[in-house]
């Protein structure tokens, strides 16, 4: 296959040839890279000290203390408005944290992550217009986190 025969994709990209096969390399930049690294670093600090096995509420309290210590701006239990056809609904979402006024952070204490919390964060992003959500799981032996971008 010639490089000219490979279909085009949206976004910045590059193709590399490996043993006669072409592989697409997406050249994406992380949004809010520095801010998200700081938030994940704060979560790692909490997990390093507490480990796994506590309730989600314990991790939320410890994470809030770590955000304060590292001077990361946040709002806890941030109420997120929901709109339907331009009208604000009475029902609102409550995100665990919104950091830097632009990153939704949802904490979990699950043995393994499943797709439910991901869908929850994507709904938060859709309703607020924010672009980045971080799903952080303290319940496993190693800290787990996912970046969700809308």
Positions of predicted regions on the chain:
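Nuclease catalytic cores
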Residues: 32-37, 52-56, 60, 64
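A short, glycine/Asx- and small/polar-enriched loop/turn
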Residues: 88-93
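Conserved catalytic cores of phosphodiester-cleaving nucleases, focusing on short active-site segments
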Residues: 51, 95-113, 124
């Amino acid at each position: 296959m010639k490089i000219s025969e490979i279909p085009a994709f949206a976004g910045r990209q590059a193709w590399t040839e490996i043993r006669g096969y072409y592989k697409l390399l997406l050249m994406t930049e992380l949004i809010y890279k520095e801010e998200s690294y700081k938030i994940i670093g704060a979560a790692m600090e909490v997990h390093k000290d507490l480990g796994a096995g506590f309730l989600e509420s314990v991790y939320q309290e410890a994470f809030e203390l770590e955000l304060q210590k590292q001077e990361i701006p946040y709002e806890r239990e941030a109420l997120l408005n929901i709109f339907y056809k331009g009208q604000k609904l009475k029902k609102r979402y409550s995100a665990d944290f919104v950091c830097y006024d632009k990153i939704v952070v949802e904490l979990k204490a699950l043995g393994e992550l499943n797709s439910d919390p991901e869908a929850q964060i994507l709904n938060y992003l859709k309703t607020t217009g924010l672009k980045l959500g971080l799903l952080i799981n303290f319940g496993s032996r190693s800290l787990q986190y996912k970046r969700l971008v809308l």
